[in-house]
Amino acid sequence: SLLQGGSAYLPGRPEIQWKNLNPMQLMEELGQFTSVDGFKEMLDKADVGQAYMERPCLDPMDPQCPESAPNKQKRRVPNIAQELAGGCYGFSKRFMHWQEELILGGTVRDSQDRLLSAEALQTMFLLMSSRQLYEHFRDNYEIHDINWTEEKAAAILETWQRKFVELAQQSAPENSSQIIHAFSTTTLNDIMKSFSDVSVIRVAGGYLLMLAYACVTMLRWDCTKSQGAVGLAGVLLVALSVASGLGLCSLLGIS
């Protein structure tokens, strides 16, 4: 929850974040001023409870570890393998369950199939789409003078992903045995774009090498046994088929 930015403000309360948000307590306080029965019913159906406030802290000595954490009073570091066995739950225990296979890799188990350790841990951040981000801030007064568009929202998301990947890769200490691999949609698009870029020099050089190979292997001094023209025609046919394929993709708008 420390990595999930997001914050909200309420008069008379400290800044509300995932690491200090207790939905049940918040509903009780808001219930003194307005009816929140609908919200309570929704939270009950989703089995939210106290959200992350009732989950164990990685460091129970951390001052920000809530008193409601199960290992806060005992000051005991949690058994990570035991906590992650069978997967883990998100904000809603009913609708947000991450299976063990999705978050752990290289697992080691005992003879009774109990999880002992894992070599890899995967975490995921779900971002808004560019359309959702645009709609979310469209009526916000703070951006009324920047000509807010969906294209700008997409640019912000792309910049955020690039910065996140950069910071994630730099977060591991130099002498650490841990390796961090950060991947995002922007990274995938960059990879696809790099493979889609066509170098005219490389393509021409490749076909010249193919032409030379075909001529050398199929050309004979005896004209009756020479098939150099066949090799030349084959290379030209391949070149024309690739060119026609690229032209068709360009015509269809596929890049």
UniProtKB/Swiss-Prot annotation:
- Where does it localize? Membrane
Alphabetical UniProt keywords: Glycoprotein, Membrane, Receptor, Transmembrane, Transmembrane helix
Task: Tell me which residues make up the SSD domain.
Answer: 199-255
Extracellular-facing ranges: 1-197, 249-255
Summarize induction of expression. Answer: Activated by hedgehog.
Q: How does it sit in the membrane?
A: Multi-pass membrane protein
Residues with an annotated glycan are 147, 175
Q: Which residues cross the membrane?
A: 198-218, 228-248
Q: Which domain of life is it from?
A: Eukaryota
In its keyword annotation, does this UniProt entry include Transmembrane helix? Answer: yes
Q: Name one GO biological process term.
A: negative regulation of smoothened signaling pathway
Q: What are its GO cellular component terms? A: plasma membrane
Q: Which organs or tissues contain this protein?
A: In the eye, detected in neural retina, iris, retinal pigment epithelium, but not in lens.
Ranges in the topological domain labelled Cytoplasmic: 219-227
What are the GO MF terms of this UniProt record? hedgehog family protein binding; hedgehog receptor activity; smoothened binding
What role does it play? May act as a receptor for sonic hedgehog (SHH).
Family the UniProt entry places it in: Belongs to the patched family.
Question: What is the protein name stated in its UniProt record?
Answer: Protein patched homolog 2
Species of origin reads: Cynops pyrrhogaster (Japanese fire-bellied newt)
